[in-house]
Amino acid sequence: MNAFTRDDFVTWMEQLARRPWPMTLDAFTDLAPELGWHFTGYQYSFTADFAAGTRKVVVIDNKAGDVHTISFVLAKPALEGVELLAELNDFFSSYVAAASETWGPPIRTVQGRNPVAAWALPQACIAEITRNEEKIHAKFLTPQGARFY
């Protein structure tokens, strides 16, 4: 799976932050084709055509029906062992640097085996990345999701 470039990560988070939140899941489903995203027919599941390739995107709503979280994989190298971890660490560091250059220092970081970094975005949104042993995952929280962060 091709990885997002650091600039593509920032661009997508900013593009999502500029959407007119709050927005219901139904309204988001109608808007998704403008982003190059397509509803799969399964609850919360979209496919997205990013520069890095097609990805599954999960869009979750709250009890009121408003979207609160959008998540997708940024990088999942086809490597193993030490090479995989080194590649993931390089990508993670690159995403952290790009986000920090754009939005300032992270509002939250977690060090260790599964590091996390999160930034405050315009319109009271949050961008978060998490690295585990296989991939780097991006999470965008709308204002409806960010208020519980």
Question: What annotation goes with each model-predicted range?
Answer:
Residues 1-113, 120-126, 130-149:
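Short helix/turn-capping signatures at newly exposed starts of structured segments
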